[in-house]
Regions:
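A helix-centric hydrophobic-segment signal that preferentially recognizes long
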Residues: 2-189
Length: 189
C-alpha cells in the first residue's frame, strides 16, 4: 500500500514537472511570437507611411517640372512602381524593395531636375523618409534577431518537442531568404 502511494506521488510529481516544463517553453515561444508580430506591425506601419510620402512627392515633382518638356516626357516613368502599387496587393518585403528603389529614384531626380533639391516640401518629405528608413532598419534588425532565436528554439532539443506538439513552423527572415532550402535564387540584392 505504501509503495503504491509512492508510485502515485512519483507519477504526479513527474506530470507536474513536465507540465511546468511544457508551460515554460510554450510561454517562451509565445513571447517571441508576440515580439515578431508586434515588430511586423511596426514595419508595416512605417512602410505604409513611407508609401504615403512618396504619393505626396509625385505631384510636387510634376508641379516643379512643368516647364521642362524633356523631363515632362519622363513623368509617366517617375515612381511608376509606386503608382502601380495602388492596384496591387504585395507583402511587406516586396514593398520594402520597391520603396528602396524609390529612394534611389528620388535622389536621381533631385540631381536631374534643377531646383528640386531646394523645394521646401521635398526637403521635409525627404527628412521624414530618412526618419522612417531608420525606424525600418532598426525594426528589421530587431525582427531578424527575434526570428533567429525563435528558429533556434524550433531546432533545439527539448523545445523542438513542444514546437512539434504546437505545430510551430520555421519563420523566414525579413528579407525572405530561406536558409534551410536549396534555392539560392532567393538571395536577391
Amino acid at each position: 500500500m505504501e509503495s503504491l502511494m509512492i508510485i502515485i506521488l512519483a507519477i504526479i510529481l513527474i506530470i507536474c514537472v513536465f507540465a511546468i516544463f511544457y508551460a515554460t517553453i510554450y510561454n517562451k515561444f509565445q513571447d517571441y511570437i508576440i515580439r515578431i508580430n508586434e515588430v511586423e506591425a511596426m514595419i508595416d506601419t512605417n512602410l505604409r507611411n513611407k508609401y504615403d510620402l512618396y504619393n505626396k512627392v509625385i505631384p510636387i515633382i510634376k508641379g516643379s517640372n512643368k516647364d521642362k518638356t524633356k523631363e515632362k516626357e519622363k513623368e509617366p516613368e517617375i515612381f511608376s512602381e509606386i503608382v502601380k502599387l495602388r492596384s496591387r496587393k504585395i507583402g511587406n518585403f516586396e514593398l520594402y524593395r520597391i520603396l528602396g528603389r524609390a529612394d534611389a529614384e528620388l535622389i536621381k531626380l533631385e540631381n536631374e531636375i534643377k531646383g528640386l533639391d531646394k523645394n521646401e516640401d521635398i526637403k521635409k518629405i525627404k527628412e521624414q523618409i530618412e526618419e522612417i528608413n531608420l525606424k525600418i532598419d532598426n525594426a528589421t534588425q530587431y525582427y531578424n534577431d527575434n526570428i533567429t532565436i525563435y528558429n533556434t528554439l524550433l531546432k533545439k532539443f527539448p523545445s523542438n518537442l513542444i514546437a512539434a506538439c504546437c505545430k510551430y513552423k520555421e519563420k523566414l527572415f525579413f528579407d525572405r531568404k530561406d536558409m534551410s532550402d536549396e534555392d539560392y535564387d532567393d538571395f536577391k540584392l
